[in-house]
């Protein structure tokens, strides 16, 4: 009688199943053209979806739908596949002065502390989801490049008319990590209203004003 040994065969079968499971795992971010994870899961720096700090913490390289040390979700909603052009505000060249660039929100926010005005990059907002006019001023958005997964947080300081966002050129270039936006003249982005964190008590910063 021939005695069969199933050990090596069983081991190979288990290994094959394990590799197949990994290959079929959902990917996201720049590894998959800026795709977002389903069920609001976080996208890790390596392009995998999950909900633990390794996936969700910005300090761990989280690419999108991040939590942890990032801003908490704010009121205003979110939108996907929105057109984002760029505008040359260059706030760093004008002391982050809203009046100097004739921003719509300067009426209400021009006298805010320098630390507030310079905390985030600037954008004009006219997106399909969220408040408009004065109600949008000063609010923050987490903006994600759908092609690469690169993201940043911006503050609304102005209005626009393109049906999406008009990012400061510096912000635009920051998330245009593959240069396609520069070639096309626009990006396709997702945005989410987030908490700006302006209520954090930072007395040393709050009194600094370069005006």
From Swiss-Prot:
Keywords: Chitin-binding, Disulfide bond, Signal. Induction: By wounding. Residues 1-25 form the signal peptide. Residues 26-68 form the Chitin-binding type-1 domain. Disulfide bonds join 28-43, 37-49, 42-56, 62-66. InterPro entries: Barwin_CS, Barwin_dom, Chitin-bd_1, Chitin-binding_1_CS, Endochitinase-like_sf, PR4, RlpA-like_sf. SUPFAM superfamilies: Barwin-like endoglucanases, Plant lectins/antimicrobial peptides. GO terms for molecular function: chitin binding; RNA nuclease activity. Residues 77-198 form the Barwin domain. It holds the Pfam family Chitin_bind_1. One of its GO terms (biological process) is defense response to bacterium. This is Wound-induced protein WIN2.
């Amino acid at each position: 009688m021939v005695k069969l040994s199933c050990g090596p065969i069983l081991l190979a079968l288990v290994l094959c199943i394990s590799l197949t499971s990994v290959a079929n795992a959902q990917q996201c971010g720049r590894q998959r053209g800026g795709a977002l994870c389903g069920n609001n899961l976080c996208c890790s720096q390596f392009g995998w979806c999950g909900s633990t700090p390794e996936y969700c913490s910005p300090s761990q390289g989280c690419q999108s739908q991040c939590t942890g040390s990032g801003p908490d979700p704010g009121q205003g909603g979110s939108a996907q596949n929105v057109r984002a052009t760029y505008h040359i505000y260059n706030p760093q060249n004008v002391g982050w002065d809203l009046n100097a660039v004739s921003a719509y929100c300067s009426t209400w926010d021009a006298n805010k502390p320098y630390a507030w005005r310079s905390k985030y990059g600037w954008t004009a907002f006219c997106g399909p989801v969220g408040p408009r006019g004065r109600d949008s001023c000063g609010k923050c958005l987490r903006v994600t490049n759908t092609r690469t997964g690169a993201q940043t947080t911006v503050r609304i300081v102005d209005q626009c008319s393109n049906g999406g966002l008009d990012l400061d050129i510096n912000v635009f270039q920051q998330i245009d990590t593959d240069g396609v936006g520069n070639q096309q003249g626009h990006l396709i982005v997702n945005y989410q209203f987030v908490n700006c964190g302006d209520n954090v008590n930072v007395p040393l910063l709050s009194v600094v004003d370069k005006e």
